[in-house]
Amino acid sequence: MSASLKRTPLADAHVAAGARMVDFGGWDMPLAYGSQLEEHHAVRRDAGMFDVSHMLNVDVTGPDATAFLRRLVANDVARLTVPGKALYSCMLNPQGGIIDDLIVYFFAADQWRVVVNAATADKDVAWMQRVAAAGSYDVAIAPRRDLAMVAVQGPNARARVWAARPAWQAATEPLTPFVAAQVADDTLVARTGYTGEDGFEIVLPADQVVALWNDLLAQGVRPCGLGARDTLRLEAGMNLYGQDMDELTQPDQAGLTWTVSLKDPERRFVGRDALEQFAAPRGFVGLKLQERGVMRAHMAVYTPLGEGEITSGTMSPTLGVSVAFARVPQGVQPGQTVEVDIRGKRVPALVCKLPFVRHGKAVEHS
């Protein structure tokens, strides 16, 4: 391990479990603990858990917190009125490019939380502070590096969490997707995830996370690394920041139009002017390879309307074929066949709506 890499509170537990550690956005993180394939299937069929403590929880509080977040993110947080409810959004630059994708939690009009990606965390906090200062918003922006985070995912994930922490069941069993409950001081359980499966993401004080991890292990929850996390999120049609979108990519070029709210003409969020003036020349689609081979990022895609490029690709453990996301010319439609350049050979691929897998089952594409 490089001395410059950051470590989560679970780093020693990963090494003790035999994890292969890699640099992920400046963090020393587990790639896999053995078989990446078995970890993937554990989440689809039973329950797996991921250390996501490298992601940053940021508390946004103060009298102007709601107005500030309505300016900061492209989705409209005013939709959130039930404490614990969350939404997914992008934070844009003035050109409409994506600074980061994130989840926003509402607790009260003056009390919110934003969860941002690890590799962009410092940049995100600096941008939030800049937007707050520019608009003279009366808000406090507090990064919470004292917290850790574990995602427990799979059809049996919730039951395993309740077995490990019975006291949490009453507050968390009624939760619907994208809703969180506070179960103890600084302990939040949200029915969210990045796999396409049911489960919880649990935020808790860093000094309590090793005990939770060990108790979940004792309940048979399988530790999973970044490798399985990537194949799971790809099957589920979920973007990865820095891979499928970045500051040069607008939401509609990354299949994220649904995360942008233009309903309130008075809400001038950062990047709105650019989005209203610019029609994206490229769309975002799923691809399913029709022959043997594996699609990977940056491979060329040939369509009747011009050339595109794969942003993420893998072999799908659930489907047994290669799947990918691609940025292609607008007008390329699901059901059409395109060609992918794999080592100089053009291989046919079916254009698909996302996701490829929903709740462990293949989504039919034709």
From Swiss-Prot:
It is an enzyme of class 2 (transferase). The keyword Chaperone does not apply. Its EC number is 2.1.2.10. GO terms for biological process: glycine decarboxylation via glycine cleavage system. GO terms for cellular component: cytosol; glycine cleavage complex. Keywords: Aminotransferase, Transferase. It catalyses: N(6)-[(R)-S(8)-aminomethyldihydrolipoyl]-L-lysyl-[protein] + (6S)-5,6,7,8-tetrahydrofolate = N(6)-[(R)-dihydrolipoyl]-L-lysyl-[protein] + (6R)-5,10-methylene-5,6,7,8-tetrahydrofolate + NH4(+). Pfam families: GCV_T (PF01571), GCV_T_C (PF08669). GO terms for molecular function: aminomethyltransferase activity; transaminase activity. InterPro entries: GCS_T, GCS_T_bac, GCST_C, GCV_T_N, GcvT/YgfZ/DmdA, GcvT/YgfZ_C, TrmE/GcvT_dom1. It comes from the Bacteria. The keyword Transferase applies. NCBIfam families: gcvT (TIGR00528), PRK00389.1 (NF001567). The glycine cleavage system is composed of four proteins: P, T, L and H. The glycine cleavage system catalyzes the degradation of glycine. PANTHER family: AMINOMETHYLTRANSFERASE, AMINOMETHYLTRANSFERASE, MITOCHONDRIAL. Belongs to the GcvT family. This is Aminomethyltransferase. It comes from Bordetella petrii (strain ATCC BAA-461 / DSM 12804 / CCUG 43448). The gene is gcvT.
